[in-house]
């Protein structure tokens, strides 16, 4: 049944539910399509796993942390002893030292204009997703590198007439190798060495590292520049290591020497801002890192 509009009001105005009665301004919808949100969140998470941190897999990582900090336990060495017949078993009295790791929140956000995807030839969502993944991945590595910097043991002054400015020489590597062994660092396949790209080039000049006569065809570094196993250690180049003047810090460590804590994995929040006609994409995470055992670095 058709109803007539009240006197003095046109039917067009009476049947428009999107018009503000006080100001005469159309109400703008502020919701974003759920399919777009879900697709974007998936892209960010997958990109972080693929393109993110290089160092996180090399350290002891704890996920699902509740609170602003967590504790990693460092246990001392035990000593075995004998006992008399029917006597008491000697007690090792292992030292337990808690190492607290503080977490911090990190963000990587950017804007996506509603009409940008109609004007550009590339996938803007993929670009923002990759950029956020790289930023968060670099921050994870920065936290781990800062924890490595807290260690104090250094392999310096190796070889007669050599200085720290001579690059990464075989003598320095062997000195560090001896220090790892003297400290009883387990040779269990969980040793890692992270060096700069210049130092990676120095390694390629060492026959024992790059010559098939020493290491065989399967371990040649020329097949890929990401990582290579040598001396029971996985070696990898990294561009974000600490630079002190002209000296690049390189690190040789055991996985259990560094602790990495995760309170929140990479998350994505997308909100619509009508005054900008754009979405703001905020990628965020909560993480921290700490030096657990200085002897292991």
Q: Would you name each region that the model predicts?
A:
Residues 8:
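Walker A (P-loop) phosphate-binding loop of ABC-type ATPase nucleotide-binding domains
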Residues 17, 39, 43, 68-71, ...:
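Structured, hydrophobic secondary-structure cores that serve as assembly/anchoring elements
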Residues 226-271:
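Glycine/small-residue-rich hydrophobic helix-like segments
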Residues 115-183:
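Alpha-helical scaffold segments that mediate packing/assembly in large oligomeric complexes
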Residues 2-3, 13-14, 19-101, 297:
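N-terminal "assembly arms/tails" that initiate or stabilize quaternary assembly
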Residues 264-297:
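H-loop/switch region of ABC-family ATPase nucleotide-binding domains
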Residues 153-226:
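Extended, solvent-exposed, turn-rich assembly/linker loops in the middle of proteins
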């Amino acid at each position: 049944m058709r109803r007539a509009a009240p006197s003095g009001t046109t039917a067009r105005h009476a049947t428009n539910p999107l018009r503000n009665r006080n100001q005469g301004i159309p109400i703008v919808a502020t919701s974003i399509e759920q399919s777009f949100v879900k697709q974007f969140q998936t892209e960010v998470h997958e990109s972080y796993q693929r393109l993110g941190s290089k160092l996180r897999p090399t350290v002891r990582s704890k996920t699902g942390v509740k609170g602003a900090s967590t504790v990693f336990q460092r246990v001392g060495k035990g000593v075995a002893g004998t006992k008399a017949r029917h006597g008491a078993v000697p007690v090792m009295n292992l030292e337990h030292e808690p190492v607290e790791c503080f977490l911090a929140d990190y963000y990587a956000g950017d804007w996506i204009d509603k009409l940008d995807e109609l004007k550009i030839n590339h996938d803007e969502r993929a670009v923002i997703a990759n950029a956020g993944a790289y930023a968060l991945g670099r921050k994870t590595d920065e936290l781990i590198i800062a924890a490595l910097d807290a260690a104090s043991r250094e392999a310096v002054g190796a070889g007669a007439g050599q200085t720290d400015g001579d690059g990464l020489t075989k003598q320095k590597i062997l000195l560090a190798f001896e220090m790892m062994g003297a400290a009883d660092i387990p040779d269990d396949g969980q040793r890692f060495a992270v060096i700069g790209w210049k130092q990676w080039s120095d390694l390629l000049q060492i026959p024992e590292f790059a010559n098939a006569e020493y290491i065989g065809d399967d371990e040649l570094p020329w097949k890929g520049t990401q990582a290579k196993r040598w001396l029971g250690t996985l070696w990898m180049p990294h561009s974000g290591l600490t630079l002190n003047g002209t000296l690049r810090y390189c690190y040789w460590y055991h996985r259990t020497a560094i602790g990495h804590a995760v309170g929140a994995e990479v998350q994505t929040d997308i909100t619509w801002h009508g005054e900008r006609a754009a979405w703001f994409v905020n990628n965020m995470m909560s993480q921290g890192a700490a030096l657990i055992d200085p002897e292991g670095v």
